[in-house]
Amino acid sequence: MKRYKFYSLIVLALCFFSCESDFLETPPQDRFTDELYWKTEANVQTFAYGFYPNYFTGYGSGFTWGSYFSGQTLNDDFGPSNPSRFIQQVPTSGGGWSFAWVRKANIFINRVQTVPMDQEAIDHWTGVGRLFRGLEYHGLVNRFGDVPYFDEELSEVDNDQLYKSRDDRTFVMDKVLEDFQFAAENVRENVASEGLMVDRNVVLGFMSRVFLFEGTWQKYHENNPAKAMEYLEAAKWAAEQVINSGEFSLGNYREVFNSLSLSGNPEVLLYREYEPGMLTHSLNSYNNKEPQTGPSKDAIESYLADDGLPIGISSQYQGDRGIENVMANRDPRIYETFVSDELRINGVHSNYSTTGYATHKFLNEEIADLPEGSSNLNPTDAPVLRYGEILINYAEATAELATLGGSELTQEDLDMSVNVLRNRPGINLPDLQVIGGLPAVNGQVYDDPARDSDVPAMLWEIRRERRIELMMEGFRLDDLRRWKKLEYVDMVDNPDINRGAWVDIDDYPGANLTNLALTEGDQGYIIPAPAGTPRIFDNERVYLNPIPLDQIVLYRDQGYTLEQNPGW
């Protein structure tokens, strides 16, 4: 049976202490009181499950698909017909400025200490609680930068704490690092969950993700190389622990994303399980018979040729006139991710793509024509944390450390990370080599003519590897943010993100192509968003979200000050 689908509902029923019930002199008979609940490890485990749907969303539920595929399109990978845009105004309320999950984690950590368990169990569950607190604070810092830090359950009358000023993001992330270090030391190495519960490797995997983000943010935004090195070392160490565990390996690329069951998949550290009639999603449907937001020309051109060279210098590249040429002799991950034998054009196909290039990374062909392959009935399992990400986290952290004066990136580093990805069964792309600090393939040093001149050549190739390996998995916007490269999503300065496949209308006689805009009239590259104002990046304030007005007013009304983010 499924492990945690309904646990959030169970926890809501059990966590009575979020409600006011002081008016009752006699404890309620139909539910636990706080004092009675925290008596067994089983109850602790049940409470912990309440965190899972919030942090391990997978493909979401119903008519959603989480951050996968087009769940996050404000980046340079997608060519939507109506492009997502940066926040333009300070919200009146909401906006993600909430500390409810911090409070929940602090309550959990506090109560675990009171449960009659042995010390190993107390330390394990404390580590689990500190993982969730760390993840929540990472999310808050990611969105807002400086935030008030709380590591204890607060009284509702302690205004000096409730309305405290924002703490510096470095102070907060140092606390988050302490949480992850404790969790890595104390969370159990093995739990009988087959990838459905938090264990030490899950902690380490998230640690590599969180501190790769924060280390690069400190480098590119805060100009703090010492703190950048500390966090990047933490990311590298965590990834290396997972690698050295020997517990994970790579199999078929696409099976990680379109399988009815991920149980036993050697690449998956943590996944969310789906079952018809219990918990389903709609991601498979939007890779199946529905119109979809397609990948940009820029994204398609980021895939290497099969000789391991960028298309701008590879003799293997056949050009972009026709899908057969675009897809010839490419990094095989392009075939695992995108439909390679046809363009899907608006006016020709009912399941058209806005760019002509269609995605099938998440499509399970076995259920494509069954009821569960359509609508919001999709039961394919969702990877939450996978080994492929851990490998590229290791490579990027190591390469970034080298730019900060750390140890040089070695061939051994590449062979235990990037080249494991390239030697995945069914991929078999030539190894990436480092020669004199520069990228090389088969002994040939090269420099991509499309490289951003601000980015060193080797780091450019590792970032490319990350983009390709994690394509459409919801990472790209945060990657551009932490690298301080949001200019890549500017449709004026980077028009190829608002371009799709090359099309000649004469190739589609009788088709109604009136909704198809092309760069050269009756032929040219598809323009997914031909009308309206193009998306631009013209203000660095959007690297952080604004704090909602109601929170600033609330602080002021209580006699305190909550500072707004710069530029808002």
Feature map (PLM): residue ranges:
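Long, intrinsically disordered, low-complexity segments
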Residues: 19-20, 98-101, 175, 260-309, ...
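Conserved, well-structured interaction surfaces
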Residues: 41-57, 75-144, 160-174, 178-195, ...
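Short coil/turn linking the two alpha-helices of tandem helical-hairpin repeats
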Residues: 141-142, 146-148, 191, 213-222, ...
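Acidic, serine/threonine/proline-rich low-complexity intrinsically disordered regions
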Residues: 153-154, 162-166, 205, 218-236, ...
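Bacterial Sec-dependent N-terminal signal peptides
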Residues: 1-29
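Alpha-helical scaffold segments in carbohydrate-active enzymes
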Residues: 50-54, 128-140, 182, 206-213, ...
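Amphipathic alpha-helical protein-interaction segments enriched in hydrophobic
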Residues: 196-210, 382-390, 475-481, 485
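An aromatic- and glycine-enriched ligand-binding surface/loop that stacks and positions planar moieties
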Residues: 20-79, 147, 181-182, 197-354, ...
